[in-house]
Every structure is written in structure tokens, then in C-alpha cells.
Amino acid sequence: MEFSFSSPLLYILYFLLFFIVRQLLKPKSNRKLPPGPRTLPIIGNLHQLRGSLPHRTLKKLSDKHGPLMHLKMGERSAIIVSDARMAKIVLHNHGLAVADRSVNTVASIMTYNSLGVTFAQYGDYLTKLRQIYTLELLSPKKVRSFYNCFEDELDVFVKSIRSQVGQPMVLYEKVSTYLYATICRTIFGSVCKEREKMIKIVKRTSLLSGTPLRMEDLFPSMRVFCRFSKTLNQLRGLLQEMDGILEDIIVEREKTTEILKEAKDDEDMLSVLLRHKWYNPSGARFRITNADIKAIIFELILAATLSVADVVEWAMVEILRHPAILKKVYDEGRGICKEKKRVTGYDVEKMEYMRLCVKESTRVHPAAPLLVPRECREDFEVDGYTVPKGAWVLTNCWAIQMDPEIWPEPEKFDPERYIRNPMDFYGSNFELIPFGTGRRGCPGILYGVTNAELLLAAMFYHFDWEIADGKKPEDIDLTENFGAGCIMKYPLTLVPHLANE
């Protein structure tokens, strides 16, 4: 049998030799790491993470080893945070120490090498971008200014469902179409002629990036051998195509439209970003570039479609599975809107019960059960244990939100629990952090939740719903599929009927 230099066996032999030499030369440490399961040589604890639902696997391990747990994931150390007390200590009390982002190979490609808010490292750049997000792009005032846009696209969405009355439809696909339309309009201000191309790229990108961690992320010493991965090359090609589309849009806007120095209430997101490029109104030491703008636009499109579609689908399925809750949602929405032709954002602000349903859905089914990993910038101590510099910090928000000591009957979908315990999910209550918290919390919570609430309100106002194929609500398969987010393994298929019939 002959081997060429490209033979996988040579890669494996090289890696084993490299690993053994590195371990022999590695200085011994007296640090006391958090408890965790025993490790195996080379792979560490990877054998214990087998399975498709890591948030559930990690919860079982944390139940045994504690809410602050150490795992060895290949060559990398990972600290797993699994209860509210520990989340507050690590993410709040030591927030600056864990403010960096752990950037994997796929994320690096998709974000122009860590530009944008999600994967930028902590510092002046991230601070500036978060200010732009929270004060201008996605502020409460700005989100309200988008109501007309949301409602116009909602009319198209409702009309599309009306054309399928009595016929089965896949909810996730229908909802995603609306979300792509709204985020493109709020970014570009009008119907973008390249929208369909961008949507295809985003869908393909989300499929290719569905595996959260790749071999080269777990074993950085193997990165040189993964450079020519087919998947990574496909991602690079998609991002190059998206880059060309966005560059043309930016150049065309700068040629044909005056970039205003002062903000306007009705300006789109691209106008905000271009103003910061041209005039730097925040007075930061640097101006944002076209690369920054393209990275921001791409992350906005991804976050505003995939995560929000997850929220809507899980909320819909839980409401349908509970007839008493379903009746309250129907009655509330139809009582507030009465004979109106469309549901507005201001109507939704009055739908307190339906909004509690969305909140409870994000507790039971967070779109990201494991918050985007952070990376420790320096050693620090927690309860006598050392969280080491360079370690990944993984927060299992699903485990926190399933804690029976905080949430009675945690598996039960109970929107009314917030009447008794009115906590919110904006990051100040560490018992409920589906969108993260602190310096790395999601700056787009209000935009995403508003869109999810508006979609659900319109669907329950205009239509009655039944499960396709004659299934009963209690027969819906709730099996999860973990990838870029946590979605239903078997997409929810429903049959709409006009409400007045």
C-alpha cells in the first residue's frame, strides 16, 4: 500500500507526534481548575459530548459536576456555566475578564475576520459599534419608526397565507420570507433589487455554517491541514458573492444620495452607517469602513431572520399545544383589533398575554441554548477555582432556564408565571438570559422580539389554525435539531383557516 504526502494517515501521525512533544514540554500548573469529568489523552472530554443536542448533554454533566465545570475539548479548555448564580459571577462580576469572543473558523470567514458586533474582540471598536446599534440602528425609537415597514410587509405575508387557506404550509419557510423582506427594507429603505440573490446566499451560508465547532477549532495545531476544506471554500465563495453585491449597493448609494450629517427619524440603517463612515459623529478615534458596513449588514440579516424564525415557530407550537392558552391569545388579539384590516405595532404593545407567551417560549426553547462562546482574557478566581486565560466560556442558558429551584415545573409552558414573577429577558435577570447579557448581550433584542410578536399577533388575529395531516396538537414532535440555532427537527406544518369562517 502506497501513501502520498496528502494521505490522512500522515496528518494523524504528525498530529500525534506534535501533541506528545507539546505535552512533554508544557510546564506544570498549580492552578485549581473547576471540577469536571475525567479526560482522555488527546481528545479530552469530546467523547462525552457525543450526540446532537450539546445543551442537554452539558446539563447532565453539570448536574453531576457542578454549575461551574471544566472540560477539555481537544486542545482547548472550556468552562461551562450552568446556573444563574454562577452566570452573574462570571458574566457580570468578572464581565470584563470574559468580554472577548471566541472566534471559530467559520465565524472568522463570515465576519470579515471578526468585524461587526457579534465576533469583534472587546475594545474601542466594539464599544463604538454597540453605541451605534443601541442608540441609532436598533434603539426603541428607531424600532418604532420601522412599524410602517413591518406592517406593509405583514400585509403581503397575510395575503400569501390567505392564498393557501385550507392547504398545508410549512410555517418556518413562510415566516422566513417575511423576515427577509423586513430586514432588507429596514436596512436599504426600499425593496432591494438584489434581495433574492442575498436571501439565497444567506440560506446557503446558514446550512454550511450549521456545525458550531470544527476540527481545527478544537485542535488549532491541525488548522494548516484544514485550510483547503471544501465547506470552508464554499463559504468563502458565498461571502465573496455577497461582498460584491453589498459593495455595489454602498457605492451606488454614495453616488446617488446625499449623505446627511444630521440624523433623520425616517432614515434606513444603511444611511446611519454611511453617516458614521463619512462624518464620524460619535467622535471615535477611527471611522468605520465599507468592510465594517458589509459585516454589520450581513450579521443583521442573519440574526433578524434565523433567530426570529426560531422564536416564532417554537412560540406557535407551544400555544397550539395548550388549548386554554390558545383561546386567551385569540380572544386578546381579536378584542384589541376588533374589525381592523391589519394588526399594527401599537396594537401589539397592548397584547400583554401574547407577549408573555413569547417570553415563556424563549425560556423553554431559547434560539441559542448555548450562548455564543466568550474567551477569557485573564485568569480569575471563582469559589476557589481558577478560570484560566484563553479558556472558552460557554453559558448554558437552557440549563439555567430549566432550573427547578427558580422555575417551578420548568418543562411546563406557563406564560402566567410572569404575572407572579415579572422578570424580563433583557439581561438584568440572570435566571432568564436567552439573548445574553452584559457587554456581549444581543443589541437587537427589541427589533427581533417586536417582529416575532407582530407576526404571531397577525397570524392569530386573521386565521384559525390546525395541525396538518389531521394530527392533534399533543402529537406534535418537539424533537430539537441543534446547528446554528436550535430549531424543530421536523418543521411545523399547519393548515390556516380564515378567522371569520
Curated annotation (Swiss-Prot):
Q: Name the predominant localization.
A: membrane
Record's subcellular location: Membrane
Temperature behavior is: Optimum temperature is 42 degrees Celsius.
Please give the biological process terms from Gene Ontology that the record holds.
indole alkaloid biosynthetic process
Please indicate which superkingdom the organism of origin belongs to.
Eukaryota
InterPro entries, A to Z: Cyt_P450, Cyt_P450_CS, Cyt_P450_E_grp-I, Cyt_P450_sf
Changing residue 372 to A/Q/E has the effect of:
Strongly reduced activity
**Catalytic activity entry:** (19E)-geissoschizine + reduced [NADPH--hemoprotein reductase] + O2 = akuammicine + formate + oxidized [NADPH--hemoprotein reductase] + H2O + H(+)
The listed outcome for residue 205 to V is: Slightly increased activity
Cite the binding residues for heme.
Answer: 442
How is this protein situated with respect to the membrane?
A: Single-pass membrane protein
The answer, when asked if Heme is one of the entry's keywords, is: yes
Q: In which pathway does it act?
A: Alkaloid biosynthesis
A GO molecular-function term, please? oxidoreductase activity, acting on paired donors, with incorporation or reduction of molecular oxygen
Keyword list, A-Z: Alkaloid metabolism, Heme, Iron, Membrane, Metal-binding, Monooxygenase, Oxidoreductase, Transmembrane, Transmembrane helix
May I have one GO cellular component term? membrane
- Annotated EC: 1.14.19.80
Q: Which PROSITE patterns match?
A: CYTOCHROME_P450 (PS00086)
Instruction: Give yes or no: UniProt keyword Metal-binding.
Output: yes
Q: How does activity depend on pH?
A: Optimum pH is 6-7.
User: In this record, what's one Pfam family?
Assistant: p450
As for family, the record states: Belongs to the cytochrome P450 family.
The protein's name is Geissoschizine oxidase
Higher taxonomy: Eukaryota, Viridiplantae, Streptophyta, Embryophyta, Tracheophyta
